[in-house]
Structure formats: structure tokens, C-alpha cells
Amino acid sequence: MSVDGRQAVIVVARLSGKGDLALLDELRKLVEAAGYAVAGELLQKSRYEDPKYNIGRGKVLELKRLVEEKKPLKVVFLNDLKPNQAYNLSKETGVEVIDRYELILEIFAKRAGSRESKLQIELAKLKRELSFAKEYINLAKRGELHGFLGGGKYAVDAYYAYVSMRISKIEEELRKIRKMKEERIARRVEAGLYTVALTGYTGAGKTTLFNVLTGENGYIDGKPFATLSTLSRRTYFHGFPVLVTDTIGFIDDLPDALVDAFYTTLRETLAADVILLVLDVSDTPAEIRRKLTASMEVLLNLGVPPTRILLVGNKIDKVSSAELEERERLLEDSGLRYTLISAARRIGIHELTQAVVEMLPEKVSATLALTREALAEDLRELLDRCRVREVVQGSDGKLLVVVEGRRDIVARLQARAGMGLVDG
């Protein structure tokens, strides 16, 4: 769907393998997520990158004709463009020419809601602009970009100074936000609250699953990057109090600058006790492998141990029994724990939450001896901090409360009760 009749032309420069077709399909979805309709496509099967245009001269002429015919607002390249290539292509076609990186930034800018995500996007854009400006100046000095330095060296220096100062201010503000987040994470641990983070390739159904697990009714549109800021809600998994967090979706070959910019958002994932890596099993096996590899690469680079990851094969209602068996073998071959669900149909949710409970770290159980008055006072705190498995009448008139939770929290509750026995 287009927004206000806006359109974009997709250009894929070098198709050198089968995986490129999947990236092309993904680019179509990104274009639509940015609010454009795909007016036309131009493909070139070549490993050679023309230094001036990225694509061959003949393809440039085809592109000009396509632009004249379709009259798009802009042209989008799958391949990364160098500053001189974007400049030359724009000059030839008469419209703005961007690459996949800039398209993703545009989507992020449209969907940013929180102050943090807006700052992160601005930071990534400014760093991109600064690197491009440096290259533009080098090209202008060599006479390849006529008129670029028309404002004089003073104007260029002023631009550098402004952007550099703005980058420093944003980074300082993000450091403060990061510190507040880390303090919040520490308070959660102090309170004994287990944390579960939903991650996965964009479009896998994370937000649908988040809504099912937490009873929320959050924003779902099926487009890439519906979630940019983290959203957390408290709930219970089989009696255990947990905080479930929905995080930004991954994408293949996400630029390092964007990963760096969204560090504070991804930090929520690193701090989680269990990471649910959601996959769309209605994809082809090749697509599932590609998306799993891309997602695992981000998680491992963040320092997430594989033992904390639970693969969640979503959308099982969209595949046949034979296809599901094939997908299950694929997940099994990953060597990670996995479970199969349909978030939309609420199939397999009980098994999913049970698997999460089994993975929660440092669980111990203990028996607390409490008077009825003490239990009445402490019941809310007990339920907020751990699972209450059983309450029975003791021989001395006290109530024996069997609880299960984090080791340090259970030990603290035991100390307050004045007695207790750790069962395991």
C-alpha cells in the first residue's frame, strides 16, 4: 500500500545467488513498511560493481526510462551505495536515490515512539550523514562533485562542528538512559523477578505472542519493525512471577551503526533470564535457516549464552503435518531447546510457558513456618517474589508455606520467617 500515492522503484544491482531473491522479497516488505508502493523493479545479475553508478551504464539508462514512466518519489537500492554513486544516480534520474540502510532508518524514524528510540535513530542518521559528508568533500576536492563546496570551507567546518556536538549530546543522554535501565534491571533482580525477553527476526509474530502471554492488546500490523522500543509487562508462568519484554526485531545484515544505536534496547535482551527466539515456521526451510542465523549472530555478538535461548517455532497452523515435521527437524538440528506454537490460535502456549519455567535459573524451594497473621501480611510479597506451591497446617499451629524462587530471595524470606528448610 502507498501513502498519499507515494511510490518507489526497487533496484537490485547484483543477484549472485538464491539467497538474493529472499532479500529482494524482504526489501519489498521494507518499502511497503516505509509507506510506499513498489512501482517497478530493475534486476542485474552481476558481481561487478560499477564505481560510478553501482549498476552498469546500460542499466542506468533502463532506470532512467523506468523513472520517467512510473514517476516515483525515490529509488531504493538493495545494495549499499557509496556517496558518489548515490549522487550520480540521483543526478541521472532526477529523483532521490537511497539504499537499504537509509530505508531502514526511514522506517525507524516513522515508528519511533519513545524518547530513547528517537535519540537512537537521530544518532544513527547523524553518524551516517557525517561519514557521507566527509566522502562528499573528498570527492569535491578531486573535482568529482562540482559545486559541493560552493559554500566554502567555513560552512563545511561549521557543519562538522554542529553535527559532532549534537552526536556528543545524544550519546551523553543515551548513557544516562542506559544507566537508568541498568538500575531498573538491578531492582528487578533485587525483587526476585524473573525476566523473559521476546526476540526474533522481524515479522515472526513476537508482538502477537507478547499479547497472548501478557493479556495485552498491543500494536500488530505484520510489517517489519512494528516494535522499536521495549515494552514490558508483569505476568505469571505457572505461579512464577515474570516480567515479559517485547524487543526490536532482527533483520539480516543489520548495519553495525544501527546495532550500536539500539544497544540500550538490545540490553534488555542480554539481561533476561530466558530469551524466546521466535521463528516463523511457515517460511521455507532455507528462509528459516537464514533468519535463525541472522538472529543468532546478533544474540551471540551481544554475549547471550545459547543455554538461555529457547527457540519458538510460531505459526504452526499455517503448515501441513509433513512440513511441520521438516521444520521440527530443522529446529532440532540447531542444538538449542525449542517448542512449537501458534500464537494467533493459542496452540502450545502452556508447553511454552512450562519450558520457560524449567529454564529459569537459581530456583530453590523452601518451607516457611508462618503464623496466620504473618501470612496475611506477607502473602502479597510472597506471590510477587516467588511461586507459592502449597500451604498446610503445621503441628504447632503455624502454617507451613512451601515456596519456590530465586535462591537469594528464598533465603531472605527464610531469614525473615526465622526458620525454613531449603528442599532443593
UniProtKB/Swiss-Prot annotation:
Question: What GO CC annotations are associated with the protein?
Answer: cytoplasm
Q: Which residues form the Hflx-type G domain?
A: 194-364
Q: Give the signal sequence positions.
A: none
Residues the record lists as binding Mg(2+): 207, 227
| One Pfam family from the record | GTP-bdg_N
Query: Which positions bind GTP?
Result: 200-207, 225-229, 246-249, 314-317, 342-344
Summarize the protein's role.
GTPase that associates with the 50S ribosomal subunit and may have a role during protein synthesis or ribosome biogenesis.
What protein name applies here?
GTPase HflX
